[in-house]
Amino acid sequence: ELFKNINLNLGHEEKIAIIGSNGSGKSTLLKIIAGLISPSEGYMEIFHNKIDSLDDFKKFRNDIAYLPQDVTNHFLCPTVIEDVIFSLRAKGVSKEEALIQGSEILEELKITHLKDRIIFDLSGGEQKIVALAGLLILKPKILLLDEPTNALDEQSEKRIIEILNSIKKSMIIVSHHRSFIDSLTSTVYRLDGKFTRL
């Protein structure tokens, strides 16, 4: 087993970081919290509701947004604006309203200039921000971020830090870059068999 007896309380608009060696289970833990996989045993509580199975998780699906380490398989549409509004359109929001909300998110993240660009022509950092925009448009209460600056250059990392510090959301961030973590939060846990607050 990768880990057991993990207790993690996430407050309103609190940012928590999890560090640990490769293979320690950081990404697996994030996927469990995101409702993508089930723990082999035990349960989770979300907003004081006990979650025993993935079926129990369904009603909280819109409250929790997960950004994977590799976002290249995350995109469903060719252009930035089409992809950012895709989830709203899938929920039945009119194209006109979705475009208004999409434009607001792009402006908030300062990427309006990318609106009509083909996603796969963008840099890795730009793709991460576009993927983040696609999550934020759904107004989740919790963001789960798996290595959000992995393989990014220094300038892109600074931009991600700036964005994450401006977002008023509860977040759990997995990263092995301690300097990145320290620029976001002082609440840091290490997962290496045991789960320890540093």
Please state what every model-predicted region is.
Residues 19-21:
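The feature captures the beta-strand-to-loop junction immediately N-terminal to the Walker
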Residues 143-146:
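Catalytic Walker B motif of ABC-type/P-loop ATPase nucleotide-binding domains
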Residues 34:
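Helix-to-loop junction immediately C-terminal to a conserved catalytic motif
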Residues 118-122, 126:
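Conserved ABC ATPase signature
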Residues 43-59:
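ABC ATPase NBD Q-loop/coupling interface
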Residues 96-114:
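Conserved ABC ATPase "signature" region
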